[in-house]
């Protein structure tokens, strides 16, 4: 099997993937600021890391996936003021929308830490930075990270020129340097606040991710994700804070960033007003199509929204459903044969070669569009060859492969489970076979075996009634 390789934004190279602890992958992804409905740009981040996690799990790793919820922030406070609502209510409303969206997209996150539930840890972390001389308290009571104390600043984003570091201009008058950034924001009237040793206030944005990732994943972990829009300043700042506080290098082994969902040549963004909310997209195209659409482009590339590209994803999804139904039908009807001819062997080899290329694509910097192209070849093989040569072994192998593909795609779950009706039919068929064999046993006067079958089935509520040579049966409800 292919070794997994992944692109690391920090080194700008595709690297061999080796987690800090063998077999255990710790992954942190920057989640949403819950001040508005999620749009289809956010959905890409959710789906890409979920699919990556599923692939790593398929390759035998245990993955712990943490995604934070930013439930206190300038954007939430502003929204609360605009709408004259409590900031907690705003956060609650859009957290619900976020969690519902994940459910629809079939994204499973292991832990969802919220900032407001980690204020104590945030204060302790800031205190460490102050004690170690990396942070200073301004006269207002705000606390800033002193960027000049961390020599590696700018490496992640490739901004080696300090001129390009300037941020949080509104605090410029009290910062030592224009590029220092807030760890703690002093309280202003009308704003939520918590008590801290240097005065009441609330956490800055970047500190939460350093704190919550280390709280759940330890002081060093494997994958840190989020959109490319977060590389500067957010991830640059997170890295500076964490490496300064822990003295561990590297804090994160692989920085993995997803490209932006674009509207034409612009990033899809609330502030530009060019968004499509996820909940509308679900109604229009369905979550499965959307999930596949995200995977049609390489995760590092921008993904430009067009109706045509979504329609293509929809067609692909319909074909996947159709191939699933075909395989299920064949698996019910296929005959088990003990012999295999050369033609069968060739098809079996083709199936296994497809499987191998599926893994080759995904293990090489998680190339999902290539994996989808390989699955497309698989579908053609089922429709053009296996359908007309439904040997049990070929059908079963195809079924197994489809399940394996879906482990990553995550769009066929409802088609791959047997429905209650299908299970009923299966059970009826199995009982009929047992009853038939029992009739033969009775004909051969092997009454002890026949009686044992009747009493064993009886224990499971299946009652056999003999009348002469014939046997009828019923299920005790
Ligand atoms: N257009 C987009 N395409 C892909 N990912 C995006 C897009 N916009 C935001 N993200 C990602 O979604 C996650 C949550 O982002 P966050 O809540 O900070 O978004 P935001 O910046 O508030 O959105 P907006 O720019 O629309 O206001 C982050 O990982 C971010 O990188
Ligand atoms: Zn973050």
From Swiss-Prot:
Motif, 'KMSKS' region: chain positions: 267-271
Keyword Translocase: no
Cofactor: binding comment: Binds 1 zinc ion per subunit.
Entry GO CC: cytoplasm
Binding sites annotated in the UniProt record for Zn(2+): 30, 209, 234, 238
Protein keywords: Aminoacyl-tRNA synthetase, ATP-binding, Cytoplasm, Ligase, Metal-binding, Nucleotide-binding, Protein biosynthesis, Zinc
Broad enzyme group: ligase
Cofactor(s) needed by this chain: Zn(2+)
Family annotation (Pfam families): CysS_C, DALR_2, tRNA-synt_1e
Subcellular localization: Cytoplasm
InterPro entries, sorted: Cys-tRNA-ligase (IPR015803), Cys-tRNA-synt_Ia_DALR (IPR015273), Cys-tRNA/MSH_ligase (IPR024909), CysS_C (IPR056411), Rossmann-like_a/b/a_fold (IPR014729), tRNA-synt_1_cat_dom (IPR032678), tRNAsynth_Ia_anticodon-bd (IPR009080)
Catalysed reactions listed for this entry: tRNA(Cys) + L-cysteine + ATP = L-cysteinyl-tRNA(Cys) + AMP + diphosphate
Single GO MF annotation: cysteine-tRNA ligase activity
Main location: cytoplasm
Record carries keyword Chloroplast: no
Binding residue positions for ATP: 270
Family: Belongs to the class-I aminoacyl-tRNA synthetase family.
Entry protein name: Cysteine--tRNA ligase
Organism this protein belongs to: Staphylothermus marinus (strain ATCC 43588 / DSM 3639 / JCM 9404 / F1)
Gene name tied to this protein: cysS
């Amino acid at each position: 099997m292919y070794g997994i390789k992944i692109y690391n934004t920090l080194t700008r190279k595709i690297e061999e993937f080796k987690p800090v602890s063998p077999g255990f992958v710790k992954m942190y992804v920057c989640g949403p600021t819950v001040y508005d409905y999620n749009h289809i740009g956010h959905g890409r981040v959710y789906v890409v890391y979920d699919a990556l996690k599923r692939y790593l799990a398929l390759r035998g790793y245990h993955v712990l996936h943490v995604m934070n919820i930013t439930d206190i922030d300038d954007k939430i406070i502003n929204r609360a003021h605009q709408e004259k609502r409590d900031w907690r209510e705003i956060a609650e409303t859009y957290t619900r929308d976020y969690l519902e969206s994940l459910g629809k997209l079939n994204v499973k996150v292991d832990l969802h830490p919220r900032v407001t539930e980690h204020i104590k840890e945030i204060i302790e972390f800031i205190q460490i930075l102050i004690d170690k001389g990396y942070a200073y308290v301004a006269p207002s009571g705000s606390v800033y990270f002193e960027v000049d104390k961390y020599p590696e600043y700018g490496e992640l984003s490739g901004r080696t020129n300090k001129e390009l570091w300037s941020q949080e201009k509104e605090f410029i008058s009290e910062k030592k340097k224009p590029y220092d950034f807030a760890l703690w924001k002093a309280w202003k009237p009308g704003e939520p606040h918590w008590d801290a040793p240097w005065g009441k206030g609330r956490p800055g944005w970047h500190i939460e991710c350093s704190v919550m990732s280390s709280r759940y994943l330890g002081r060093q972990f494997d994958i840190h994700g989020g959109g490319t829009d977060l590389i500067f300043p957010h991830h640059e700042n997170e890295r500076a804070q964490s490496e300064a506080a822990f003295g561990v290098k590297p804090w994160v082994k692989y920085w993995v960033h997803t490209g932006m969902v674009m509207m034409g040549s612009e990033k899809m963004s609330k502030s530009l007003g060019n968004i499509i909310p996820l909940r509308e997209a679900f109604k229009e195209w369905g979550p499965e199509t959307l999930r596949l659409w995200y995977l049609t482009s390489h995760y590092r590339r921008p993904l430009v929204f067009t109706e045509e590209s979504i329609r293509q994803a929809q067609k692909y999804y319909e074909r996947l459903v159709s191939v699933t139904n075909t395989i299920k039908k064949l698996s019910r009807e296929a005959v088990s044969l003990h012999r295999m001819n050369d033609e069968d062997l060739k098809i079996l080899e083709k199936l296994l070669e497809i499987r191998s290329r599926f893994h080759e694509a995904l293990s090489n910097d998680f190339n999902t569009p290539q994996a989808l192209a390989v699955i497309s070849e698989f579908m053609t093989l089922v429709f053009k060859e296996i359908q007309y040569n439904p040997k049990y072994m070929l059908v079963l192998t195809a079924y197994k492969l489809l399940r394996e593909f879906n482990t990553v795609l995550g769009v066929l779950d409802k088609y791959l489970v047997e429905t209650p009706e299908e299970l009923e039919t299966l059970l009826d068929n199995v009982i009929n076979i047992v009853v038939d064999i029992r009739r033969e046993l009775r004909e051969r006067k092997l009454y002890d075996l026949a009686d044992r079958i009747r009493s064993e089935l009886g224990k499971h509520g299946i009652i056999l009634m003999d009348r002469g040579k014939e046997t009828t049966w019923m299920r005790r409800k």
